[in-house]
Amino acid sequence: MLDAKLIKANAALVEQQLEKRGLSGVLKPFLALDEERRKILVQVEERKNFRNNSSQQIGKMKKEGLNPADLMEEVRQAGQQIKELDEELARVEKEIEKILLNIPNLPHESVPVGEDEKSNQEVRRWGEPRQFNFEPQAHWDIGPALDILDFERAAKLSGARFTVYKGAGARLERAVINFYLDIHCGEHGYREILPPFMVIADCMVGTGQLPKFAEDMFKLEGKDMYLIPTAEVPLTNLYREEILEAKDLPFYLTAYTPCFRAEAGSHGRDTRGVIRQHQFNKVELVKLCEPQNSYEELEKLTKDAERVLQLLGLPYRVVVLSTGDMGFSAAKTYDIEVWMPGYQDYREISSCSNCEDFQARRANIRYRPDPKAKLQYVHTLNGSGVAIGRTVAAILENYQQEDGSVIIPEVLRPYMGGLEKINRPEA
């Protein structure tokens, strides 16, 4: 959530920044309501001053033997007016909060300006896409042929956009999860968390999924709770409504969780394979840090996500997202896109974002820089470290062999009981 004081003090500048995200005129309702709020506060103050002064006057009149009945009636009416004004003030402030909760974060000055992904800028590449001496297959063909991915039975169980992993496929998924957690905890200094997979609505508001993106979430019927769309939600909200110690920052947190998304706006996109699912596994990275360090931490976070792909030998590129392609809560985002031979293209496998104080303000996560300093909001960062299903898909496509088998990357073999290759089942 943006700082209301910042908006009022720099309305034109904030409007200009929001226009970079393709939004125009979004501050007008806020500014109009804020002016209404100011006028109500003036009226409340006037009524309270009248009531206080009149109360003193009534006391004097009684001492002097005068009848204060008329003035007492005016005081009673003033009290009623204050009550009505307070109710109106609460309504206006609720409307202001509603508007603020639907305004996205402001882009960092280094973010390229553009309408959509066409304006994203490539930052670097790692690895060379493999040159095949045969026609490479897509993972949605490789997996079923190996009898490790079953889309038809998944549809029988749950409908579209689900996958059943079987045998070596299930083991490969689990191997990738454990490998990622071991690297992030053992080499990169993250603390592993195993959070609940359901959260209350306040947590979804804190990280920015609600209220704007409610249709993309799975809500529990009859309860004010949601299935998590990403572990970013519980990890960040672990410290909701808390004051942290500066000496304890930064926090590096990681978690493996299943993620649940309705994908309401993705009809017709990536209908085959595991790229866009209602349920998928992911290892998430979250950081809470002091504001002056957050962009350095973003670079480190992105490198941490890149590292696991390097160890797997999967070619990728890093792009910085344009203002029109960034997520709602982000001030700056790097996407890591892995090479997928079946698509003959790079596909997103991780997004690494600095949200600055946007989420912390919504979730009220603060810290005190030193014992005498005023409380400040921390900066929050998050990134996939990385998506598990998409990793499995990338392994199947990049390590496929002409006979239909798939080589297991060396770093995963200890997690696979020494298995070096997944072969097609014998007829």
Swiss-Prot record:
Q: Which domain of life is it from?
A: Bacteria
In the record, which residues are listed under signal peptide? none
CDD domains hit by this protein: SerRS_core (cd00770)
User: What EC number(s) does its UniProt record assign?
Assistant: 6.1.1.11
Q: Looking at the UniProt record for this protein, which Gene Ontology cellular component terms does it annotate, in alphabetical order?
A: cytoplasm
Indicate which residues the UniProt annotation says bind L-serine: 230-232, 284, 384
The chemistry this enzyme catalyses reads:
tRNA(Ser) + L-serine + ATP = L-seryl-tRNA(Ser) + AMP + diphosphate + H(+); tRNA(Sec) + L-serine + ATP = L-seryl-tRNA(Sec) + AMP + diphosphate + H(+)
Specify which residues bind ATP according to the UniProt entry for this protein. 261-263, 348-351
Cysteines paired by S-S bonds? none
Where is it mostly found? cytoplasm
InterPro entries the UniProt entry points to: aa-tRNA-synt_IIb, aa-tRNA-synth_II, aa-tRNA-synth_II/BPL/LPL, Ser-tRNA-ligase_type_1, Ser-tRNA-synth_1_N, SerRS_1_N_sf, SerRS_core, tRNA-bd_arm
Query: In Gene Ontology terms, what is a biological process of this protein?
Result: seryl-tRNA aminoacylation
Q: Which GO terms describe its molecular function?
A: ATP binding; catalytic activity, acting on a protein; serine-tRNA ligase activity; transferase activity
**UniProt keyword terms in alphabetical order:** Aminoacyl-tRNA synthetase, ATP-binding, Cytoplasm, Ligase, Nucleotide-binding, Protein biosynthesis
**What Pfam families does the record tag this protein with?**
Seryl_tRNA_N, tRNA-synt_2b
- Where is this protein found? Cytoplasm
| PANTHER family (UniProt xref) | SERINE--TRNA LIGASE, SERYL-TRNA SYNTHETASE
Family per record: Belongs to the class-II aminoacyl-tRNA synthetase family. Type-1 seryl-tRNA synthetase subfamily.
Q: Give the protein's biological function.
A: Catalyzes the attachment of serine to tRNA(Ser). Is also able to aminoacylate tRNA(Sec) with serine, to form the misacylated tRNA L-seryl-tRNA(Sec), which will be further converted into selenocysteinyl-tRNA(Sec).
Recorded domain comment: Consists of two distinct domains, a catalytic core and a N-terminal extension that is involved in tRNA binding.
Listed name of the protein: Serine--tRNA ligase
Q: Which organism is it from?
A: Syntrophomonas wolfei subsp. wolfei (strain DSM 2245B / Goettingen)
Q: Organism classification, top ranks?
A: Bacteria, Bacillati, Bacillota, Clostridia, Eubacteriales
